[in-house]
Amino acid sequence: MNKPLRFNIELGRTKPVNIRDEQVRCPFCDRSKLTDILDTSGHIIWLMNKYPVLEKTWPTVIIETETDEGEFSTLPADEAAHILQFGLDKWRETRQRQEFKSVLFFKNHGYMSGGSIRHPHSQIIGLENYDYHKDITAQNMEGWLLHEDQHVRITLSTHPIIGFFEYNIRFKPDTPVRPVAIRLQQVLRYVLHTLSNLSQSYNYFFYNLEDGYDYIKVVARYVTTPLYVGYKIPQTCDEERAAKITRDIAPYLQATK
């Protein structure tokens, strides 16, 4: 059984927070002051997180755009594919390091996502003593079929991690990245324009579960249900609602770019 990660509260209090208040200076916009850079590709920068609040981890950040603007679903397909490919490469590279039991790769967007910085970015965190595979299984990636083609399979979770609506994108590690990026953009547009139209917040998470596939789980964010907070009980919708979501998301998934 995994032990909880320890969070450094005092260091956390020093982090800049501008996800709600745009008057707070963005630490990612002034690139001349960025340090501990690990790699770059065009305007994308991978660097160490200046605020390593989680003990026994290797926290890094991928700055995806040059400015605070540029939510992933609004980007040109080629730029989205470039960002996704860079992130996948660095995640897979980090997973090869023997000092980590598992490696997280995820993105926050919006004030209810748990993030602190508005500037588009994602995070890769190596965990020295925590193996997320003990908590997450392939069953969490299964569900009602929303779309399937030669590159991806998209489902709505019947066994979500937290609920209510979790969208899973399954693909082979050698799948061309552009169609995966396009499908991710389409799911995010659906989430932002329908389910999450009030909070405008989401997360997406990457998983490798040693079953021959990689997964992206898109989660629309709201206030967390007390059933999960108090009892770890996830919730999902019924068949009728799932059928409606299948119909509603279809127009978003029809486009090929």
What residue spans do the PLM features occupy?
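Active-site microenvironments that recognize anionic phosphate/pyrophosphate groups
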Residues: 1-86, 90, 94-113, 117, ...
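Conserved, mostly hydrophobic/aromatic
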Residues: 121
